[in-house]
UniProtKB/Swiss-Prot annotation:
Co-factor(s): Mg(2+)
Subunit field text: Homodimer.
GO (cellular component) term, any one: cytoplasm
HAMAP family reported in the protein's UniProt record: Adenylosucc_synth (MF_00011)
CDD domains referenced in this protein's UniProt entry, alphabetically: AdSS (cd03108)
Keyword hit for Nuclease: no
Biological pathway: Purine metabolism; AMP biosynthesis via de novo pathway; AMP from IMP: step 1/2
Protein name: Adenylosuccinate synthetase
Organism: Culex quinquefasciatus
Function field: Plays an important role in the de novo pathway and in the salvage pathway of purine nucleotide biosynthesis. Catalyzes the first committed step in the biosynthesis of AMP from IMP.
Length: 458
């Protein structure tokens, strides 16, 4: 009887070498990739200058990603004296050698996206068609979501949340209640897409009697958008994992900021997505072991757009000076930002949530003209010092802030490019932040342009 031929064990499966033991398999699970993801997150209430940091780091990146939010975010990046404004696009799109990904956690307003591309093309953005990749799982923001956003805010009257009225909240609500519409729906059977769209319209009509949408006109628009969008769309999860296995450098640009996170921010005065580290994982389909550096971007003072508690807010001439010198007007909303002192109690909290491995302190130069600078170090609630950040906005509105006062430097820092050349008082200010948070400051912003960054060496 002929013996059966022996079948040799495969040496590789799906491109992975076959391991010989559980220990080896476990080790591969702990570190299956040749590279790690660098994440840039806002550490306060947004507008910290994340786009500038991403633009700087994107020069060395192969891929830059957005993972959450929509066109309620706003980044300005200055390149060769030209201001590029980004709302949906990753600001790394300026870098012609890297891919830009809009991940599944982002909600996309297609009219806004194509308008943003056109505006930045007019300013010199080129060849984006070969570099922009959009997730097929991302949800779509329709004009009707923006209409609903305005109606909901109007219903709240004097208790409105101060949203950007970009339709972000209603779109994420549609996603959570499972009647949202994704990019893959638009690119699939258009008849089915039309039925889903009509169902969404009818749902809102039941909620708002005066709600009106020209369904035929909208579907005609979106048939055109489908053709324009199709070449840009793919499965970004597989693309990213493949890129990490190849050792590609991946950079993630968080939108909004930690204190606007729907779970950890000053709820309900927050955005509708997770803009802390968790949103990076769910918004791109990445496991925790892919994360390397987590860079927290900290403005040298604190700002906030819209309503909600703000313990260190200034209502005096110093607040006005910060608004004026800092050009504190929202990129997206054009609203004047509220300004206040740096809040270390708040930053300790966001550092716990996000696990920063490094910091970038921006707009240090805005403090150049102040003789004295106050820094919040803790809060008192009901007469007692607390060692936590209040989860209730009622409690947060009642805290008494404990400040320390440090000397200003009364000299311009705008031309400084080495940490050792900063005035001693400015160096002390940076060291105060580092020592309190236990996180190194690696970069300091002292002006608008990408060249106005101090690289802090050990």
């Amino acid at each position: 009887m002929e013996e059966p031929s022996k079948v040799s064990a495969p040496t590789a499966v799906n491109g992975h070498p076959v391991v010989q033991s559980h220990a080896e398999m476990h080790q591969r699970c702990l570190n299956p990739y040749r590279s790690k993801v660098t994440v840039v997150l806002g550490a306060q209430w947004g507008d910290e200058g994340k786009g500038k940091v991403v633009d700087m780091l994107a020069t060395e990146a192969d891929i830059v990603c957005r993972c959450q939010g929509g066109n309620n975010a706003g980044h300005t990046v200055v390149v060769n004296g030209v201001d590029f404004d980004f709302h949906l696009l990753p600001s790394g799109i300026i870098n012609e050698r890297c891919k830009s990904i809009i991940g599944n956690g982002v909600v996309i307003h297609l009219p806004g996206l194509f308008e943003e591309l056109a505006k930045n093309e007019a300013k010199g953005l080129t060849n984006w068609e070969s570099r922009l990749i959009i997730s097929n799982r991302a949800h779509l923001v329709f004009d009707l979501h923006q209409q609903v956003d305005g109606l909901q805010e109007a219903e709240k009257g004097g208790k409105s949340l101060g949203t950007t009225k970009k339709g972000i909240g209603p779109c994420y609500s549609s996603k959570a209640t499972r009647n949202g519409i994704r990019v893959s729906d638009l690119l699939g059977d258009f008849k089915v897409f039309g039925e889903k769209f009509e169902s969404l319209v009818n749902m809102y009509k039941r909620l708002f009697p005066n709600f009106e949408v020209d369904i035929a006109a909208e579907l005609a628009r979106y048939r055109d958008y489908a053709d324009r969008l199709r070449p840009l769309v793919q499965d970004t999860v597989s693309f990213l994992h493949g890129s990490l296995r190849e050792g590609k450098s991946v950079l993630v640009e968080g939108a909004n900021a930690a204190m606007l996170d729907i779970d950890f921010g000053t709820y309900p005065y927050v955005t509708s997505s997770n803009c802390s580290i968790g949103g990076v994982l769910t918004g791109l389909g990445l496991p925790p072991q892919t994360i390397g550096e987590v860079i927290g971007v900290v403005k040298a003072y604190t700002t906030r757009v819209g309503d909600g508690p703000f313990p260190t807010e200034l209502h005096d001439e110093v607040g006005s000076l910060l608004q004026t010198r800092g050009g504190e007007i929202g990129v997206t909303t054009k609203r004047v930002r509220r300004c206040g002192w740096l809040d270390l109690a708040l930053l300790r909290y966001t550092a716990m949530v996000n696990g920063y491995t490094a910091l970038c302190v921006t707009k240090l130069d805005i403090l150049d003209t102040l003789k004295e600078i106050k820094v919040a170090v803790s809060y008192n609630l009901n007469g007692e010092r607390i060692n936590y950040f209040p989860g209730s906005i009622t409690a947060l509105g009642q805290v008494e802030v404990n400040y320390i006062t440090v000397p200003g430097w009364l000299t311009s820092t705008e031309g400084v490019r080495e940490f050792s050349e900063l005035p001693p008082q400015a160096q002390d200010y940076i060291r105060l932040i580092e020592n309190d948070l236990g996180v190194p400051v690696k970069w300091i912003g002292v002006g608008k342009g990408r060249e106005s960054i101090i690289n802090v060496k050990d």
